[in-house]
Regions:
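Glycine-rich beta-strand-centered segment in the early N-terminal region that forms part
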Residues: 22-40, 51-93
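NAD(P)H dinucleotide-binding glycine-rich loop of Rossmann-like/cofactor-binding domains
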Residues: 80, 90-153
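Mid-domain Rossmann-like dinucleotide-binding core that forms the NAD(H)/NADP(H) cofactor-binding site
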Residues: 125-199
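Glycine-rich phosphate-binding loop and adjacent beta-alpha segment
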Residues: 225-294, 326-328
Length: 328
């Protein structure tokens, strides 16, 4: 089969290669999926660049955790009725070397989720990390019905789904965005208000947008940079759920202030989510796909031969929405 691989760390153009490699073998609890689309996420780019020094200890890596395709074979413990299913895949390149940037993948059957008939393979490849991370951020600390939620970076991959999860389940959601185009994208999916986080003291605008009431929940894309702003507008007993702190990866925490707020700080990464949380997310994702209640954005698509461009555009931080690699 044809696959993108890397066997050393470095820039996308330098280390990503297209090669013909052996087709995957199948274990009893696995399925083999003929992939149509592979989703590129920031975590994939960081892995390729060398964020995890032991990643290549067992040989080359086929990148990417998210994807979509059609099941073409099943292991002995999987019903043959699954052959022919259109599926979305998550957590493919986690604690293993082989991800979705290939023509075929063997993967635990529980990680290949049947797509509703009304949902395209393109949409399926967008779901794993962004939609599941957003779901965990919104729901990990209980019902959001009637709650006030602030989502920073609402036009981003995770933030876009976080706004939708909050609104679909009865919350008031205010978002931040850095330009008029992103602001409109947030409003189009239901945000009750949007403020510009590039402005000085933007948290005051966020408070005004919520009629002066502080927030119950925060879903935050840049924890370290935003903390000095966001703490001022969070309620006592509130929760901050954050999935990234790229600009300030080692933030200092005002411990006493946070303690006296009875603040819950939740760090979210999809790989570490409890299985129940993953299953809850999958159930809600498929239900809302079936009812056409989730919106998705594909920003760019590239052929497998141009996979390096997909990594580079993620690194440039110049686009919003999903980046896909076309396999078929």
């Amino acid at each position: 089969m044809k696959a993108a691989i890397f066997d050393k760390f470095g820039s996308a153009q330098e280390v990503l290669k297209i090669q013909n490699i052996e087709d995957p073998k199948i274990n009893d609890n696995e399925v083999i999926v003929k992939l149509s689309k592979s989703g590129v996420n920031p975590s994939d780019v960081k892995k390729r660049a060398g964020a995890f020094s032991n990643l290549l200890d067992n040989g080359f890596v086929i990148p990417h955790s998210d994807g979509a395709g059609i099941i073409v074979d099943v292991g002995n413990e999987v019903s043959r009725d699954r052959i022919g299913e259109r599926v979305w895949i998550y957590q493919a390149q986690y604690e293993r070397n082989y991800g979705t940037a290939a023509e075929l993948i063997s993967i635990d059957s529980s990680r290949a989720i049947k797509l509703p008939d009304n949902t395209s393979l393109e949409t399926g490849a967008c779901l794993g990390i962004p939609a599941m991370t957003a779901h965990r951020c919104i729901f990990a600390d209980g019902s959001v019905k009637g709650k006030n939620i602030l989502v920073t970076g609402g036009a981003g991959r995770v933030g876009y789904y976080a706004i939708q999860w909050g609104k679909l389940f009865g919350a008031r959601v205010i978002s931040t965005a850095s330009n008029d185009h992103d602001k409109q994208a947030c409003l189009d999916i239901g945000a009750d208000g949007v403020v510009n986080h590039r402005e000085e003291d933007w948290e005051l605008s966020a408070l005004d947008e919520n009629n002066g009431e502080k927030y119950d929940r925060l879903v935050d894309v840049e924890f370290g940079v935003n903390l000095e702003h966001t703490l001022n507008i969070m309620k006592t007993g509130s929760t901050i759920a954050t999935y990234s702190s790229t600009q300030n990866p080692n933030p200092e925490l005002p411990f006493l202030k946070m303690m006296y707020m009875d603040l819950t700080l939740r760090l979210v990464i999809v790989y570490a989510m409890p299985e129940k949380a993953k299953n809850d997310a999958i159930k809600d994702i498929n239900n809302k796909l079936s009812s056409n209640d989730l919106s998705h954005r594909v920003a760019k698509s590239y052929d497998l031969n141009d996979i390096a461009k997909g990594h580079e555009i993620i690194e440039s931080n110049s686009i919003r929405g999903c980046v896909l690699i076309n396999i078929d």
